[in-house]
Each structure stands twice: as C-alpha cells, then as structure tokens.
C-alpha cells in the first residue's frame, strides 16, 4: 500500500508510519496494543492540526539539552519507537555517545531479539553513510 499513497496526500507521513507499524506488527516486532497506542497519538496530532506546538518544541529542546549534559544518558525505546524513529535515535545516540535500550512492557525473548536485530540493521545502514558537510551537534 505504501507505493499507492501519493506524496501529495495531506496525511502522507501519517499513512506511511501506519503502514510501517502494520508491517512491523505482522513481523512480530510489536505488542498487540501498539496500533492502539499509535492511533491515540495520531488522534491528538490531528486535533492539534498536525503541527508541533510551541510547548512540544520547547520540551524537545529541553530533552536534547538534558541528554547532552547527562553523565550517563540512556535512550530507552519501545517497539513503535524502534520502527518509526530507530535510525534517528541511533544517530542521536552516536552524537552523544550513549546506549539505546529496548524497554518493552509486553516483553518476550523473541520480540526483544527482533527489535535488537532491527536496530542493528539500522546501525549498519547508518554506519555506511557519510557525515553531512558542516555538520555540528548542538
């Protein structure tokens, strides 16, 4: 279905994210409640006009500052986060030299293994990319 969604669709990113989660669920990466949790967040995004609010942006910046200043930072992720933001989180973790932990409520050895494999796949992909010119961590 991903290829059928035109990039001009106003909810393109949302629909692509949803499809990625559906596939991840079929692949055994997510808990049964993962789509419910994502849908709840999507509802709020829709109600907020699909824009990052000023307070949310302020919170994002505060988290970045705290991670950067922390003596022993750790990025803790669940299945949805691994699927939707895993690559970006690996880049952040590399920038601030911190580990990423898989922290899932409905934990099974198989799910943990699959999520670790996914994150390792992302890590291998990212390790082959060049650092952008004039890149600077802020």
Regions found by a protein language model. Name each.
Residues 1-99, 109-111:
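Electropositive, gly/pro-rich neighborhoods at or near active sites that engage anionic ligands
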Residues 93-138:
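Long, charge-dense
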């Amino acid at each position: 279905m991903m290829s059928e969604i035109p990039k001009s669709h106003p909810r393109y990113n949302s629909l692509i994210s949803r499809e990625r989660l559906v596939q991840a669920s079929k692949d055994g990466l997510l808990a049964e409640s993962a789509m419910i949790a994502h849908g709840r967040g999507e509802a709020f995004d829709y109600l907020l006009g699909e824009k990052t609010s000023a307070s949310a942006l302020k919170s994002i910046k505060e988290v970045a500052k705290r991670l950067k200043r922390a003596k022993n930072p750790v990025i803790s992720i669940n299945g949805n986060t691994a699927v939707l933001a895993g690559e970006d989180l690996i880049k952040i973790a590399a920038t601030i030299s911190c580990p990423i932990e898989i922290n899932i409520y409905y934990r099974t050895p198989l799910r943990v293994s699959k999520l670790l494999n996914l994150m390792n796949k992302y890590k291998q992909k990212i390790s082959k990319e060049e650092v952008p010119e004039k890149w600077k961590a802020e």
